[in-house]
A protein has these predicted regions:
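PLP-dependent enzyme catalytic core of the Aspartate aminotransferase-like
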Residues: 1, 127, 193, 209-263
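Short hydrophobic/aromatic beta-strand micro-patches
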Residues: 56, 178-180, 240-242
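Active-site beta-loop-alpha junctions enriched in small/polar residues
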Residues: 19-21, 156, 182, 242-244
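Short glycine-enriched loop/turn motifs at secondary-structure junctions
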Residues: 48, 171-173, 232-235
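Conserved small-domain helix->loop->beta segment predominantly found in fold-type I
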Residues: 105-108, 112-114, 119, 123, ...
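Residues that form or flank phosphate/diphosphate-binding pockets in enzymes
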Residues: 23, 186, 248
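Broad gene-expression machinery/nucleic-acid interaction feature
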Residues: 50-52, 176, 236-238
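Conserved PLP-enzyme active-site core in the AAT-like
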Residues: 1-145, 152
Length: 263
């Protein structure tokens, strides 16, 4: 089943953010995507040390058909009337980005940052395998823990996207997920405050295991009703599972639960 809706009905390219999926676990273009974007700061770089992004163009989208993309399809006066769609063909979109957007905004990654991201790709498959393996064990641990109300992970049979997860992610995935601890905000804070291996940080997809309380940080501008619409509650905790030894990760989580119990 392709991801792509009918192009004739929308006239728009299908753009997929594959930051969390990574090219190692899923390649959206093979499923009908026209353009794929990544925040390379996450899994591709792997260590949270630099900022960068990637755009991958399938070259399959017709930028002239709908008449909606004059900046790419029509003659461009700043390039002597050249139409990027005609001159660059399948590379029209990425050529437009390089020739126009980079020219106008000056967004240029430094050589050292580029080096860090390229270096990260050398260990991408190795790291993702470990992220996935650790995540499976953490999900199992949490799903069977008496102090956990709910685990939100597509690998679990009761998750609404479980069938899609099994179809598109046969090698696993989703090392960033949330769970609801039994109790409320106080229990969530106590749990987080007593973790040692997990770092309390807002970023994700790092070799380091990370934890945060979304309701008071990333989504703090929302009221309780708006939070609930996003399935975020005062007892919701977000985890980003790293590549540490699984025994250390599980022991750290259990220490957090023990602190909530007053032990």
């Amino acid at each position: 089943m392709p991801l792509q809706p009918s192009r004739t009905s929308t006239g728009l390219p299908l753009v997929i953010d594959n930051t969390f999926g990574t090219p190692y676990l899923i390649r959206p273009i093979e499923h009908g995507a026209d353009i794929v974007v990544h925040s390379a700061t996450k899994f591709i770089g792997g260590h949270g040390t630099t900022l960068g992004g990637i755009i991958v163009d399938s070259g399959k989208f017709d930028w002239k058909a709908s008449g909606k993309f004059g900046n790419i399809a029509d003659p461009n006066p700043s390039y002597h009337g050249v139409s990027f769609a005609d001159a660059a063909g399948p590379a029209a979109f990425v050529t437009y980005i390089r020739a126009i957007l980079l020219r106008d905004t000056g967004a240029t990654i430094s050589p050292f940052n580029a080096f860090l991201l390229l270096q990260g790709t050398e260990t991408l498959s190795l790291r993702i395998e470990r992220h996935v393996e650790n995540s499976k064990k953490v999900v199992e641990f949490l799903a069977n823990h008496p102090q956990v109300e709910k685990v939100n992970h597509p690998s679990l049979p009761d998750h609404p996207d479980h069938a899609l997860y099994e179809k598109y992610f046969p090698n696993g995935g989703a090392s960033i997920f949330t769970f609801n601890i039994k109790g409320g905000r106080e229990e969530a804070f106590k749990f987080i405050d007593n973790l040692k291996v997990f770092s309390l940080l807002a970023n994700v997809a790092d070799v380091k295991s990370l934890v945060i309380h979304p309701a008071s940080t990333t989504h703090s501008q929302l009221n309780d009703e708006e939070l609930a619409e996003q399935q975020i509650y005062q007892n919701t905790i977000r985890l980003s599972i790293g590549t540490e030894h699984i025994d250390d990760i599980i022991a750290d989580l259990e220490a957090g639960f023990a602190a909530v119990r007053g032990e």
